[in-house]
Every structure is written in C-alpha cells, then in structure tokens.
C-alpha cells in the first residue's frame, strides 16, 4: 500500500502500544508510564497503570492533532491481505519477534492490523 512511513506509524503505533500493554503488562506498563512521565510530563504519583494507559491515549491524540489519518480503511485497506502482510513482517523485516518488548507472532500482527482498521 502506498502510505508514507510516518503516516503508517501514526496509524499502527497506538494499536501496537495497546497490544503490548495487554499482552505483557509487567514489562510494558512501567516503560510506557516512564515515557508518560519523562516525555509527556505526567505525574508519577498517578501510578504506573494509569500513566501507561494515558501515554497511549496521549500518543494517539498527538497524531490526531497533526491531522494524520487514523485508520487503514481511510486508505481503502481492508483485512484481505493481513495474513500476507504479517508473513512479510516476520520474514522480510527483523524476523523473530518472540523475544521482543512484548512478544508478537503472526496472529498478534494480524490483531494489531485489524485494530487499525
């Protein structure tokens, strides 16, 4: 699909963040909360879970404030090729995501893409 890299990231990133937080909260929540405190200026007293979720929403809000399209559907993309896209990510990009920040497999990639519709 003909989407610039930055726009694609703006669409996918909040959904990737939600996926990571849901699937590996013990590791991800402190990192996202730290991002919220150190980059977005959140109050650490609000707690890790609150700040992690707020960081995701604030990130999505930031992309919206730039006027960036928020869904893959806005580009005429549906789920027809999500399986192929997931396979491409796993083979043509960096490969094994099972040991990443929040492990992501083929089904996880499809879940993130679907949430981005």
Annotate the PLM regions:
Residues 1-58:
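Active-site segments that bind and position negatively charged phosphate/pyrophosphate groups
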Residues 36-117:
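C-terminal charged capping/lid subdomain of soluble metabolic enzymes
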